[in-house]
Amino acid sequence: MPNSKKSKKGGDQQHVTIVPVEPVKGENVDTVAYSSRSRISGESGHLIADVQSPHAKKHRIIFDRDHNVFEFRLLDGSAKHIIVYRLDELLSTTCYPFKIKNGVPIIPTKPTTSDKTLYFNFVYKKDKQKWRLKQIPVIFYTTSERDYWHSLIDTTLRRVKNRPKNIIIFINPFGGNGKAQKIFKDNVDAFFWLTPGLRYKVVLTERANHARDYIVEMPPEQWSAIDGLVSVGGDGLFNELLSGALLRTQTDAGRNIDNPSSHLVTPHIRFGIIGAGSANSIVSTVHETNDHATSAVHIAIGSECNVDVCTVHQHQKLIRISANAISYGWLGDVLRDSEEYRCLGPIRYQWSALRTTIRHPIYRGMVQFSLSHKENVNPKDQLPPCLEPCPVCMKPQGNDKYDYHWHAEFTHVICCVIPTVTPFTPYGLAPFTGIGDGTLDLALVPRISRFHNMQFMRKVAMYGGKQLYELDPSLNCYRVTKWSYQPDADQEDPGVWNLDGEILEQPKDEPLHFKLHPQLISFFGRDAAMVKPTKRSFIKKRKSSIVYQ
């Protein structure tokens, strides 16, 4: 592209080269004056500029507006040294540099604008899980040319539909051992600050259910204006955001959320989590890491994936909503016991696990369920006979709500909405289910000994649910769409549920019903297998600091 060209009148006039959709050569390339660039119809074509690196190496930038990619090419007489970035990998462009520490930007207090340099701030995949930011400085030949590119790219990024424009961030100041605010300030805030067109409001929660009530009571004009809700805390805070948004959406749509058979409406907003809790299983499952900067990157660039949700009902009334894991028996008792030792921090779970193992709780009850169409196994061929007396077996016509049932003594009853990756289950708890595959994994473990239970939990941590399903014959696991549990009435303690890290009391004389709602919500995240890690070459970087970062 001509960088500046003397006009016949003696003045300087900026030119921009636009290449049409079908590449042509010679005289068919249009040269459009800077002052008349608004005449360019649509957003197609190629924008080209010859630039320099900080080491004075000549390069060419091509912005392909048809395919939304940037091509950086070293002009050394060969076509070998080229790198291409997608538009959705560009966080922003700035006219000033800023510090980047371990791939995390630091907001400058007094940014100093460079004369002709434009800084491209790209996000990239550092390894198999983590995402980081890198800055590519590009030196144009004139300041006006630099400003034009900056204005054009900034406007383009603001128009990207999937990028959030207005989000509310809820921070639990007690999360992460009281470090949630610091986590947000040091690892997240700068990403949002750099994102063009992103407005965000921070709300510090003051009590339990504060976030849920805030969302439910939000004025209609504010609710319709936001397009994202972000939690900085543990799974409990995210559950508040999820519950509040779903309640608000169903109320506005006139849906009866208390009815398990209702077809629920998907909220218009997306959810994000910055993990600052003890387990952080939801964010670890979606991103395959609990890394704060990675979560911030996916929110800022507008990554999106759909996630299943499970509603919990008692007597035709909604009592809880889950997008993680629901467990009963040993795991529920561990959570209940750990509440007495919150002062110990995350280590309280190990202490309570030891205490619960010694106590070795066993619960007798009835599990009923209906299989997903993706399940190929017939439970009647695998499940042992029911304990007698079984209320369903005694009925001549069985149960019209569920296809299968099992009355037994249980050590574990576990339902996974997502694979459930945690520090204690790094390979995932669920054998089969995915993030949004439209199934629940229902795992039933009958009465087993203390030693067997210790071996069972050790195998879960070492191999994950998928390998455990093949190693332990006591595990009965099925892919279901709905199910229920009712404890026997003669038990003094009906037990509790561990629902997304929060305690849910099991009624003594009534069943709880669990219903799957496939891909009900959208999450700021993407399939980890879609993008390969970026490989660096320090030798080649000497040749081009733009192409080889």
From Swiss-Prot:
What pathway is this protein a component of? Lipid metabolism; sphingolipid metabolism
Enzyme Commission number(s) from the entry: 2.7.1.138
Q: Which GO terms describe its molecular function?
A: ATP binding; ceramide kinase activity
> What catalytic reaction does the record list?
an N-acylsphing-4-enine + ATP = an N-acylsphing-4-enine 1-phosphate + ADP + H(+); an N-acyl-15-methylhexadecasphing-4-enine + ATP = an N-acyl-15-methylhexadecasphing-4-enine-1-phosphate + ADP + H(+)
Active-site residue list:
235 (proton donor/acceptor)
Domain named DAGKc: which ranges? 162-316
Classification via Pfam families: DAGK_cat
GO annotation, cellular component aspect: membrane
A GO term (biological process) for this protein?
ceramide metabolic process
Q: Where is substrate bound in this sequence?
A: 233-236
Keywords, sorted A to Z: ATP-binding, Kinase, Lipid metabolism, Nucleotide-binding, Sphingolipid metabolism, Transferase
Keyword Ubl conjugation listed? no
Which residues participate in ATP binding?
A: 172-174, 205-209, 240, 277-279, 342, 348, 500-502
Query: What does it do?
Result: Catalyzes the phosphorylation of ceramide to form ceramide 1-phosphate. C.elegans contain specific sphingoid bases, which are unique or different in structure compared to the sphingoid bases found in other animals. Two examples of these distinctive compounds are: 15-methylhexadecasphinganine and 15-methylhexadecasphing-4-enine.
State the protein's name.
Answer: Ceramide kinase 1
> What is the originating organism of this protein?
Caenorhabditis elegans
Lineage of the native species? Eukaryota, Metazoa, Ecdysozoa, Nematoda, Chromadorea
